[in-house]
């Protein structure tokens, strides 16, 4: 599943139709690789209590079967951390090993050290890992105070970094705009710069211990903040000679149509710029509903092709058949033929030209009849009521049909 075609180039990259992804180091998470030119990885997170062993195993399996390649679980206590050992064991017994990430937050050193034994990656939040309760009377941090807390962070982070390094496992430094540490807020403000500096502080500690299996995220609930943070992170990493892969997401995107649009606006924009190595669409819905959105974003950008690509005009007064109904029938009949491009066009105006790149075309040319195309070549004209059946026969004749 993790294979890439040879990138195409033109003499003017700014007008290229191929997305040129930023070069990043490969980071292994179980049997999945993030970055390093591998396909963009799809992630999600279960919402079961990790102490519910059976429920967690079932939830992880459901996500993985839908195409979620890395699954995150929350680990708020030592009991939850130890439960991961059983979850991992049961997954292997009743299903198969699945790359797992533990989400560790407030003052989580002991929890992180325990759970690092049982998962493939540990996610920490720099704003909460060494949690300093905000003071209502404080208005600034002196340089000495800033550095004192920085040293405390180093002492607390080092044991986890050493553990992950020695086990060959990975870490995600996951900055959230809404949970920046107070000293970062006072020093840099509630800004993308504060998010980036927060991540860099943790990266430098990791690098000082020769640990480089790092993935970075800088999430925000507002798309413009999220975009600015990732772009600034890339700029700073380029300046510092860093090549860590990036995990993209809009946190707290909500639900329904708007939640999907909001996530796509953030994630899709960065991916189109070549930024991003793994994604999670965060919806206030069942986690399983996040996975199709992820793959749709990747397919739309040409980064991963995991379904049929349908090209269809929006319909107008020239349309010679019920376009919406026919598109539905074509989709239902062919949606399992991963890798094909199929065009459904209502009239000859938008027909051959607009669908030139499609493998097959279904075009209205005169009332009661449709024309079937292979690429740019018209193959036959058939009665409208036989159109879908004849399209299937054409695909079969070309040896490109597989039974659903």
Curated annotation (Swiss-Prot):
Its cofactor is [4Fe-4S] cluster. Binds 1 [4Fe-4S] cluster. It catalyses: (2E)-4-hydroxy-3-methylbut-2-enyl diphosphate + 2 oxidized [2Fe-2S]-[ferredoxin] + H2O = 2-C-methyl-D-erythritol 2,4-cyclic diphosphate + 2 reduced [2Fe-2S]-[ferredoxin] + H(+). InterPro entries: Dihydropteroate_synth-like_sf, IspG_bac, IspG_bac-typ, NO2/SO3_Rdtase_4Fe4S_sf. Pathway: Isoprenoid biosynthesis; isopentenyl diphosphate biosynthesis via DXP pathway; isopentenyl diphosphate from 1-deoxy-D-xylulose 5-phosphate: step 5/6. [4Fe-4S] cluster binds at residues 313, 316, 347, 354. HAMAP family: IspG. Belongs to the IspG family. This is 4-hydroxy-3-methylbut-2-en-1-yl diphosphate synthase (ferredoxin). It comes from Crocosphaera subtropica (strain ATCC 51142 / BH68) (Cyanothece sp. (strain ATCC 51142)).
């Amino acid at each position: 599943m993790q294979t890439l075609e040879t990138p195409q180039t033109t003499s003017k990259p700014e007008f290229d139709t191929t997305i040129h992804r930023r070069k990043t180091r490969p980071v292994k998470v179980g049997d999945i690789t993030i970055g390093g030119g591998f396909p963009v990885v799809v992630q999600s997170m279960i919402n079961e209590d990790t102490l519910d062993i059976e429920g967690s195993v079932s939830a992880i399996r459901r996500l993985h079967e839908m195409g979620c390649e890395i699954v995150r679980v929350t680990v708020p206590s030592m009991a939850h951390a130890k439960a991961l050992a059983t979850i991992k064991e049961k997954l292997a017994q009743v299903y198969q090993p699945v790359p797992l990430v533990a989400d560790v937050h407030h003052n989580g050193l002991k929890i992180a050290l325990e759970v690092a034994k049982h998962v493939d990656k540990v996610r920490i939040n720099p704003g909460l890992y060494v949690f300093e309760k905000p003071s209502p009377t404080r208005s600034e941090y002196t340089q000495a105070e800033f550095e004192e807390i920085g040293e405390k962070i180093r002492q607390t982070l080092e044991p986890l970094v050493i553990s992950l390094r020695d086990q060959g496992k990975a870490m995600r430094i996951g900055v959230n705009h809404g949970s920046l540490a107070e000293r970062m807020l006072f020093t840099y403000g509630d800004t993308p710069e504060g998010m980036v500096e927060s991540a860099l502080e943790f990266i430098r500690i990791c690098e000082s211990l020769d640990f480089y299996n790092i993935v970075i995220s800088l999430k925000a609930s507002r798309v413009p903040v999220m975009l600015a943070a990732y772009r600034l992170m890339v700029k700073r990493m380029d300046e510092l000679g860093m090549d860590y892969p990036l995990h993209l997401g809009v946190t707290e995107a909500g639900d329904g149509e708007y939640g999907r649009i909001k996530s796509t606006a953030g994630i899709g924009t960065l991916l189109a710029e070549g930024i991003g190595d793994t994604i999670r669409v965060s919806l206030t819905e069942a986690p399983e509903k996040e996975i199709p959105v992820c793959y749709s974003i990747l397919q739309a950008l040409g980064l991963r092709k995991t379904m049929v690509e349908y090209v269809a005009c929006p319909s107008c007064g020239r349309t010679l058949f019920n376009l919406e109904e026919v598109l539905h029938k074509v989709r239902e009949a062919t949606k399992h033929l991963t890798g094909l491009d199929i065009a459904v066009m209502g009239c000859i105006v938008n027909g051959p030209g607009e669908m030139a790149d499609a493998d097959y075309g279904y075009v209205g040319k005169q009332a009661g009849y449709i024309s079937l195309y292979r690429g740019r070549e018209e193959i036959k004209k058939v009665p409208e009521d036989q159109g879908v059946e004849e399209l299937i026969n054409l695909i079969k004749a070309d040896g490109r049909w597989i039974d659903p």
